[in-house]
Curated annotation (Swiss-Prot):
Species of provenance: Gracilaria tenuistipitata var. liui
Protein name (Swiss-Prot/TrEMBL): Large ribosomal subunit protein uL22c
Keyword Kinase: no
One Pfam family of this chain: Ribosomal_L22
Example of a GO biological process term: translation
The UniProt record lists the keyword Ribonucleoprotein: yes
Length: 114
């Protein structure tokens, strides 16, 4: 007898957020039910919450396309990996320039059926 688990995934790439700050929010929703995670993200005040909520809703809609109900979904995995850094220069005194690196990250959320 094979126990086949369905993997539903949504990814946000090149998101203009810090990986560390994004992971702080993702750790709060790992292992939670879909509806509970949406509520948590709505009431948290961190910047990544809005984007993570959009990615989570996208994963939920992917589940609907596969004929699964959102009430039965659990967040199996949620992780953020480093993306490329945007390099900018800021003018400083005496003709110098300081390099500013603006981080990006790739956010992936995997859902499974309860």
């Amino acid at each position: 007898m094979t126990n086949k688990t369905t993997n539903i995934q949504a990814t946000g790439k090149y998101v203009r957020l810090s990986t560390a700050k994004t992971r702080r929010v993702l750790n709060q929703i790992k292992g939670k039910k879909y509806q509970e995670a949406i509520l948590i993200l709505e009431f948290m005040t961190y910047k990544p919450c809005k984007i993570i909520k959009k990615i989570l809703e996208s994963a939920g809609n992917n589940a609907l396309n596969l004929k699964y109900e959102k009430q039965n979904l659990i967040i199996k995995q949620a992780f953020a990996n480093d993306g490329p850094k945007l390099k900018r220069f800021q003018p400083r005194a005496q003709g110098r320039a300081f390099r500013i690196q603006k981080p990006t990250c790739h956010i992936t959320i995997n859902l499974s059926i309860n």
